[in-house]
Amino acid sequence: MAKAVDESTYEQRVRALYDKQIRMEAREAGVIKKISKFNSNLLDLKEAVVRHHQKVGKVRKVKMLRCGELEKRANFMEELTQELEATKQRNLVMRDQIKQLNVLARQHRNEVMESIHTLSKTTGTYLNHEALPARVKGVTVLRNDNSDQLIPFDLKATDVEGLESLCQHLQGFNIDAFQWRQLVSLATEMSMDSHTTPTTPPKEAAEGKSIIEIDLTSPTSHI
């Protein structure tokens, strides 16, 4: 009887050990499964970290490129601003120079007009400024006690011989040929200036306005 009890107890112990081993194996299998899953998750995580680092690297590279572009753009804008400022300053200087040149031009024009007026009165010669610079056209008035004598002329500006002959003819009436040539030269200079307004011949020359040619064969015009 005692022997049967011992065998039954032994069998229970063996079965208990077997069941315990089965449970341990099942637990071990579960642990192994969890470890395998953990390792798989860890591997996925590592791969995700690697991909993340790659993306971060790309982002950093793009950021560096963009920063470089922004820096270049900022430098370009700064250079452009400096160039615009320099251009503005140059324009201001040029504007002042143009103003000064305009002032000098007006002064020169006024001086020339004053000289023309003086020479015109001195020589008694009044030019048709509309005919210049192609032609030298006008009239010289000889003042006399009884009546004024008009010597009209109309020559091409390139007619050197004709102009020289006219000067010699005028010298015969005590007209200063140098002053007469200077008058023609200054009047021609004024006519070539597009901003010059032709001067109006004085009232004394109105009578000779319709006479446009000199007759070198006439008694009063003979050299």
UniProtKB/Swiss-Prot annotation:
Keywords: Cell cycle, Cell division, Centromere, Chromosome, Coiled coil, Kinetochore, Meiosis, Mitosis, Nucleus. It is found in: Nucleus; Chromosome, Centromere, Kinetochore. GO terms for biological process: cell division; meiotic metaphase chromosome alignment; meiotic spindle organization; mitotic metaphase chromosome alignment. GO terms for cellular component: Ndc80 complex; nucleus. Residues 65-115 form a coiled coil. Component of the Ndc80 complex, which is composed of Ndc80, Nuf2 and Spc25. Acts as a component of the essential kinetochore-associated Ndc80 complex, which is required for chromosome segregation and spindle checkpoint activity during meiosis and mitosis. Required for kinetochore integrity and the organization of stable microtubule binding sites in the outer plate of the kinetochore. Participates in SAC signaling that responds specifically to disruptions in spindle microtubule dynamics. The NDC80 complex synergistically enhances the affinity of the SKA1 complex for microtubules and may allow the NDC80 complex to track depolymerizing microtubules. This is Kinetochore protein Spc25. It comes from Drosophila lutescens.
